[in-house]
């Protein structure tokens, strides 16, 4: 690496469904490869589990409870040496509604 800082786009993806997340990551990586950028990833981050404890009965039986959980899966994709063509292609990319995307330049 040179002393100059390289240009990099960091894309963070979050979703409840890991299959949807993986297909979105594959689309992003393929788009970056088509425009001659060098993608790194998808890098899996730890899955966050959120557990909710709810009473089963509205009146008595405090000991009877039910647990629900949501799992948030996360991935990072880094794209090095992006061109304006890469950025345009990523902006036009159609991704599912269940995937949350954050882009940092």
Swiss-Prot record:
GO terms for cellular component: ribonucleoprotein complex; ribosome. The keyword Ribonucleoprotein applies. One of its GO terms (biological process) is translation. Keywords: Ribonucleoprotein, Ribosomal protein. SMART domains: Ribosomal_S10. It holds the Pfam family Ribosomal_S10. GO terms for molecular function: structural constituent of ribosome; tRNA binding. The keyword Ribonucleoprotein applies. SUPFAM superfamilies: Ribosomal protein S10. Gene3D superfamilies: Ribosomal protein S10 domain (3.30.70.600). Part of the 30S ribosomal subunit. Belongs to the universal ribosomal protein uS10 family. PANTHER family: 30S RIBOSOMAL PROTEIN S10 FAMILY MEMBER. Involved in the binding of tRNA to the ribosomes. NCBIfam families: PRK00596.1, rpsJ_bact. This is Small ribosomal subunit protein uS10. It comes from Acaryochloris marina (strain MBIC 11017).
């Amino acid at each position: 690496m040179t002393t100059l800082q390289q240009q990099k786009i960091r894309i963070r993806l979050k979703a409840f469904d890991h299959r949807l997340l993986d297909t979105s990551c594959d689309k992003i990586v393929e788009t970056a490869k088509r425009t001659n950028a060098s993608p790194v990833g998808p890098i899996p981050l730890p899955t966050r589990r959120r557990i909710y404890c709810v009473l089963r009965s509205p009146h008595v039986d405090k000991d009877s409870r039910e647990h629900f959980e949501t799992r948030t899966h996360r991935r990072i994709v880094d794209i090095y040496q992006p061109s304006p063509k890469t950025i345009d292609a990523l902006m036009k990319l159609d991704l599912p509604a269940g995937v949350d995307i954050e882009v940092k330049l």
